[in-house]
Regions:
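Alpha/beta catalytic barrel-like cores
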Residues: 1-147, 154, 164, 175-177, ...
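Structured alpha-helical segments in the cores of large, soluble enzyme domains
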Residues: 71-79, 119-126, 159-175, 200-214, ...
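Short, amphipathic alpha-helical segments
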Residues: 110, 145-160, 195-202, 236
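Active-site groove signature of glycoside hydrolases
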Residues: 166-192, 218-219
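Short linear capping/connector segments at secondary-structure termini
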Residues: 184-186, 225, 327
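Acidic/histidine-rich catalytic cores of soluble enzymes
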Residues: 188-303
Length: 419
């Protein structure tokens, strides 16, 4: 079917496909740098084990080993993905050289991310940022909740440094910077004290957010998690803790939900409208959990589509929902992992924009539930793919799976030589 034919079919149900395409082009999605090197970073031994209850599996050849390689890989992904992009950085991706020699995480400065800023500015990209509270000798294994004052002070200073870096990135790039605070602090077995670590965690975040910043430019987030490897019994930053902290401090931070950080029977799609009933702004990490926070590559599955439906229906595209990707798969080609996930979130958003949401809402309000089911099911066989192809063409990126040929050539010419 041609795009014009698909356009007519959608017009028959009250949907303007041209308007949907134009709207989607303006929606920024933050591409996570850590897929490219399996979350290793550049500030400590790249062969160190991951800590914080997270794990990368696989050893597919071609992992980025230097900032230059990582940026080159990201450039390939950018050329294959439609829409507006940001780059999401972790503090462990600081770039050190003769002019700016290595410093520890509590001493990081904006200059250690100048090359990332230049990279983004040259491509018209925004940037988001994350303090890195894992895979470091100062994890004891706790960080911001540690009873050890020296440990806690180190990580508080790291968080304050990251506030300054986020402010720098936002000012230089002219776009708000979401700065996400997440730690893997917790215990493997039943703790004797659940409140003490949370009191310390709260005090630590309070001190981090006392660092001056413009809340219109820097959006500190508090992210929760249900459990991780080695912290099965208790997580300091639980869902209740993180959400309550954000609600209590809504003048200086926003909540962030990662759809892999909840019990497997919970769905973030249902939480989005609940939070937007109270918060003017929230943030999301979109991933694909399989039985736990496994961070598989995002597919065009039911929950991804439901998440994007709620973003669109709740007015999230008007600056109320900050969307970022967060997954890491080392068992497949990393360029493909990035590209598949990014394009799938875009597909899910486009599908939501091609839904006659006002008409469906009216059916629900009028309690015409039989017709609502019929109309919703009919949408599943609409010619969405033809509209998606037109969107890709209008963004000057490959249509269908044509992009994979570029990835295969890049693997032959570049990635295969990284040995």
């Amino acid at each position: 079917m041609s795009y014009q034919e698909a356009k007519q079919k959608y017009a028959a149900i009250g949907v303007d496909t041209d308007a949907a395409i134009a709207r989607l082009k303006t929606v920024p999605i933050s591409l996570h740098c850590w897929q490219g090197d399996d979350v290793r970073g550049f500030d400590t031994d790249p062969n160190k084990p991951l800590t914080g209850g997270i794990q990368t599996t696989g050893n597919y050849p071609g992992r980025a080993r230097t900032p230059e390689e990582l940026m080159a890989d990201i450039d390939v992904v950018l050329s294959l993905c439609p829409g507006t992009k940001k780059i999401n950085l972790h503090a462990s991706y600081a770039i050190f050289d003769e002019e700016n020699p290595w410093v520890d995480r509590d001493k990081l400065e904006p200059k250690h991310f100048r090359k990332w800023m230049d990279f983004c500015k040259a491509r018209g990209l925004g940037a988001d940022f994350n303090p890195t509270y894992f895979s470091h000798p100062m994890c004891d294994p706790l960080t911001l909740s540690s009873p050890n004052e020296e440990t806690r002070r180190f990580w508080i200073n790291h968080g304050k440094a990251c506030i300054r870096i986020s402010q720098y990135l936002a000012e230089e790039l002219g776009q708000p910077c979401t700065m996400n605070i997440w730690t893997g602090d917790g215990f493997k077995d039943v703790p004797a004290d659940r409140k003490g670590p949370r009191d310390r965690y709260r005090a630590s975040i309070d001190e981090i957010l006392s660092e001056p910043y413009d809340f219109k430019l820097v959006k500190p987030c508090i992210e929760s998690k249900v459990f991780g490897i080695g912290v099965e019994a208790y997580t300091v930053g639980s869902a209740e803790f993180a959400l309550t902290y954000a609600a209590y401090n809504r003048d200086k931070c926003i909540p962030l939900m990662d759809n892999g950080h909840y019990h497997p029977t919970e769905v973030v799609s249902d939480k989005i409208p609940a939070l937007l009933a109270f918060f003017p702004e929230i943030a999301l990490h979109v991933t694909r959990p399989i039985r736990w926070d496994s961070d598989h590559v995002v597919l065009l599955d039911d929950e991804t589509k439901e998440i994007c439906k709620e973003i669109v229906r709740c007015g999230g595209l008007d600056g109320r929902v900050n969307i970022a990707l967060d997954y890491f798969d080392a068992s497949i080609n990393r360029i493909s992992a990035w590209t598949v996930g990014f394009r799938n979130v875009q597909k899910a958003l486009l599908s939501a924009l091609l839904t006659p949401n006002d008409a469906l809402r009216a059916l629900q309000d009028e309690q015409r539930f039989t017709e609502l089911m019929v109309r919703q099911e009919a949408l599943k066989t609409m010619p969405f793919g033809d509209v998606w192809d037109e969107y890709c063409r209008s963004c000057n990126v490959p249509v269908g799976t044509d992009w994979f040929e570029t990835v295969q050539k890049y693997e032959r010419d570049v990635l295969s030589k990284r040995v």
